[in-house]
Design a protein with these regions (language model features):
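A recurrent flexible, glycine/aromatic-enriched loop bordering the glycosyltransferase active site
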Residues: 73-96
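C-terminal catalytic/acceptor-binding lobe
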Residues: 88, 105-167
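A generic structural signal for short hydrophobic patches within well-formed alpha-helices
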Residues: 99-102
């Protein structure tokens, strides 16, 4: 974040391929609302008590490819609004218009840095949204999942943001 003074920043996994050429225009259109701080492509409207975003009802749309399958993941087809407000987004793609410090003091790996950053944006008073997409804006070619430290970081997340709720 400190490497650039750009107002808008996009954080993207190394295994994500963008498929919508003009997505930046959609992102800028959404960011015209100054109350929106972050945009993701997959998120949850209500973060579950166990802190695991993937255990909640998700919204968004991506193509996904991993060791088990290759498919279009559709979590929501609600096209009544240009976007849906969420409590957390997946870190595969995060666009921001404000600089909120990452909690590198707590999260040093692949797990929970994204949900933590989502909580930091909410604490700062900003909305987090997932845009309506008629087709996915990216392919996530995740291959093998490495969850070696997932439970460790989940407990840290729960302690920091959810009062130690250890479901």
């Amino acid at each position: 974040m400190q490497e650039s003074d750009a107002k808008y920043k996009i954080y993207i996994h190394q295994d994500v391929f963008l498929t919508k050429r003009d997505m930046i225009y959609d992102i800028l259109r959404i960011f015209k609302d100054s109350s929106i701080g972050m945009i993701g492509l997959i998120g949850t409207q209500k973060l579950p008590d166990d802190g695991c975003m993937w255990h909640g009802k998700r919204v968004g749309r991506i193509y996904t490819n991993n060791i088990l399958s290759s498919k279009e993941f559709i979590a929501s087809e609600d096209n009544e609004k240009p976007y849906m407000q969420v409590e957390a987004v997946d870190g595969l793609f995060m666009a921001t218009q404000y600089d909120i410090t990452w909690r590198e003091d707590l999260f040093t790996g692949w797990d929970f840095y994204d949900v933590s950053q989502s909580q930091e944006f909410l604490k700062a008073g900003y909305k987090i949204v997932v845009p309506y997409m008629d087709k996915p804006w990216c392919i996530h070619d995740e291959g093998f999942l490495n969850l070696d430290r997932y439970e460790e970081f989940r407990k840290i997340f729960l302690e920091e943001y959810m009062g130690g709720n250890n479901h």
